[in-house]
Amino acid sequence: MNRRQFISKSAAALTLAGIAGQDAMASISAKPNRGRIGLVLYSVRNELPKDFEGTLKKVSAMGYSAAELFKINDGDFFGHPLKEVRVMLKDLGMSITGTHTGSGVLPEDINAPEWDFWKKISEYVRTVDAKWAIQAGFPGAKSVDDLKRLSAHFNRVGQVCQKNGVKFAYHNHHAELGKIEGEVILEYLIKNTDPKYVFFQMDMGHTVNGGGDCTRYLREFPKRIPLWHASDFDAANRKYTWLGKGSVPYPALFDLAKSSGLEVLNVEQETLENTLEACKSDFNYLKQFKWTKA
């Protein structure tokens, strides 16, 4: 932490100036960025309201080739129509991989009106030429029976999404590494959902925070975890940090990337201090790994 703060304070001005200086190049190039590293735009949630297009340009100039959205339940993203966001990012050389969203447990009958939510979300995902609708967080499970109902619900969500042209995934936080009646929540959900309909987006930092072994999950559940959130957690100091400075074993994870079926890699920067500089550092850390090359 002290070392990072020292570096960030001494280099922040130069780094951000360099990013800003690349804005013009990013704005006039419609060619896709090289590589396979995306950014969860939740990472820059404080910057987007201040300068939406300018922030996206800075992200593109860092080298990111894709973005993940969030809070599009009303058909827009920070007040911008989704079609406009899609075009804006495409002009910056970036695609959209999917969005975070979510609902509580809905009626078993997928023709019930409550299921219009997931049909609408699927339409929004298609509107931005993306593939994934991702639920982040589980509704108040307190027993194994609750987990059983939740698993059945996720199966139905996956079916509805698939019928509407997108795929469904569940994103874990550290809480899902806890146990209910002796069952690790995340493992129960993976084992008791249908692999045809339900996939998982593993947040690496949250998994380590919860005491989980990311590499074990990739080995034991191949093809079930095609999406990664690249975040980092310093287990010794109990805090989220920049990629490569924490306890997530990324070299070992990327050794398993192909065999585990990794499809989508998005950085999620959990810290809010020097966010743009952190996102640039995260990109530079990940680009050393062979999988990230186009």
Protein language model features and the residues they cover:
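Histidine-acidic metal/acid-base catalytic patches
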Residues: 4-19, 25-38, 44-56, 60-62, ...
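Active-site acidic/histidine proton-transfer and metal-coordination neighborhood
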Residues: 10-12, 21, 107-200, 276
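Acidic (Asp/Glu)-rich catalytic clusters
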Residues: 31-32, 56-61, 78-97, 117-129, ...
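Acidic-and-aromatic substrate-binding clefts and catalytic sites of carbohydrate-active enzymes
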Residues: 44-50, 70-81, 104-115, 139-148, ...
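N-terminal substrate-binding region of glycoside hydrolase catalytic domains
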Residues: 64-78, 100, 134
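A short, structured active-site edge motif that brings together acidic residues
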Residues: 98-104
